[in-house]
């Protein structure tokens, strides 16, 4: 019986190792580095189920482990995933580190498929918690998964912004702030509608003293996009 258990363990390790490609993400954060194990790499594209292990850069201590159903990212023509432990560039990695909720701690977004609008990238978002652990955040994951890719982070205004699109001529940006309970709420939005002739209609909405203030402006297309 003992021999059977040992054999099964060896077989499991062998199959896991064969099925996964290994990468390093050492340049995405000043505080953290990561090892990435992903199921599939074909040509210049990697995807599928993946495990991400995050380490402290200074101490090499393992901080947390994450899983993604579809860790989708690309490789350059000179990178060969079969070599193992391939180091990914800062803007190539499927991991995004940053202070998303402006509490002074570095948070993490992990690529999980292309579930955004027009098949744009989607991300699972984790906020930093006590003892360097990360907690999943459903509100920010929704914002990073149902719009045009990852939200923008503006440190100066302490806002995050998502982008939406409907066809060729309708674009919307929604800006969010965080309340006392660290929950994002819509603070303002800008709609750009260029569906009528050569006119761009810009509709701005902002919450002022609990009320929505709305302004509508019209511009010549050539003037608006040359500003």
Question: Predicted segments — roles?
Answer:
Residues 64-68, 135-142, 186-193:
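Beta-propeller fold detector
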Residues 66-86, 192-207:
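Surface-exposed loop and turn segments in beta-propeller and other repeat-based domains
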Residues 26-28, 89-102, 152-155:
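Structural signature of eukaryotic scaffold interfaces centered on beta-propeller domains
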Residues 72-93, 142-152, 170:
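Repeat-based blade/solenoid architectures
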Residues 99-112, 156-161:
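Acidic/hydrophobic-patterned starts of short beta strands in beta-sheet-rich repeat architectures
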Residues 55-58, 119-139, 174-180:
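Beta-propeller blade repeat segments, especially FG-GAP/WD-type strand-to-loop junctions
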Residues 17-62, 155-227:
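Acidic, small-residue rich beta-repeat scaffolds with periodic aromatic anchors
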Residues 1-22:
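Bacterial Sec-dependent N-terminal signal peptides
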């Amino acid at each position: 019986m003992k021999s059977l258990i040992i054999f099964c363990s060896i077989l499991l390790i062998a199959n896991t190792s064969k099925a996964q490609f290994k990468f390093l993400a050492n340049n995405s954060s000043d505080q953290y580095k990561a090892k990435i194990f992903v199921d599939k790499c074909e040509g210049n594209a990697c995807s599928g189920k993946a495990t991400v292990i995050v380490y402290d850069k200074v101490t090499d201590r393992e901080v947390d482990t994450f899983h993604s159903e579809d860790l989708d990212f690309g490789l350059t023509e000179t990178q060969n995933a079969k070599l193992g432990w391939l180091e990914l560039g800062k803007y190539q990695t499927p991991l995004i580190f940053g202070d998303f909720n402006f509490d002074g701690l570095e948070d993490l977004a992990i690529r999980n498929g292309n579930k955004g609008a027009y098949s744009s990238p989607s991300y699972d978002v984790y906020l930093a918690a006590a003892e360097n652990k990360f907690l999943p955040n459903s509100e920010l994951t929704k914002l990073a998964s149902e719009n045009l890719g990852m939200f923008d982070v503006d440190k100066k205004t302490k806002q995050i912004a998502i982008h939406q699109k409907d066809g060729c001529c309708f674009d919307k940006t929604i800006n969010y702030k965080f309340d006392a309970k660290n929950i994002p709420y819509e603070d303002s939005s800008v709609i750009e509608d260029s569906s009528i002739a050569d006119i761009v209609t810009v509709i701005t909405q902002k919450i002022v003293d609990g009320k929505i203030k709305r302004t509508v402006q019209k511009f010549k297309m050539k003037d608006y996009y040359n500003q």
